[in-house]
């Protein structure tokens, strides 16, 4: 699910110290450092890419790449369910990795600080796994059994969908992340995904839907907890 290089210019303008209003506890929080789970996810993805790159020295195939990638045809013949998870942390080259991690640093920091590390991590993993499962169904339905898919963008779209839901349900929740900005970011990504070949648009769309649904569930639960004084 490779991301176009245009993301670098778009999101580089967004990576800066931000402030947003936390309506759940009435505090203002400054994003002046990267939250721990977001940072760990970025480090893990970079570490895996380094190992893959070392394994490909001399034109060889990386054993780790073969172990983690989600190859549709092979998965259908012999379902190795862990690949629905491992492929979320695997990328096809440094450009693919850099584009995804740049977005994750920004959106992940917002989501993790707003919702807490465990809710954030849960939505990230559920969105990524769900996006991969949907991708298997989609490519089998299309007859594209030779497709191999990997990347964090399904999970990242889940975080974008989560934030979109929260912004819609609590107007003005984020001072620096507006509804218009989120919609533009997602539309921009999808547009270039459909305009270019080799992009897993199914993962993007399904990831966003899963994240949005998770956002509804989390928002309602947090409102309930606040009403009950918990």
What are these regions, as identified by a protein language model?
Residues 2-3, 9-230:
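A detector for small-residue-rich transmembrane helices and their helix-helix packing motifs
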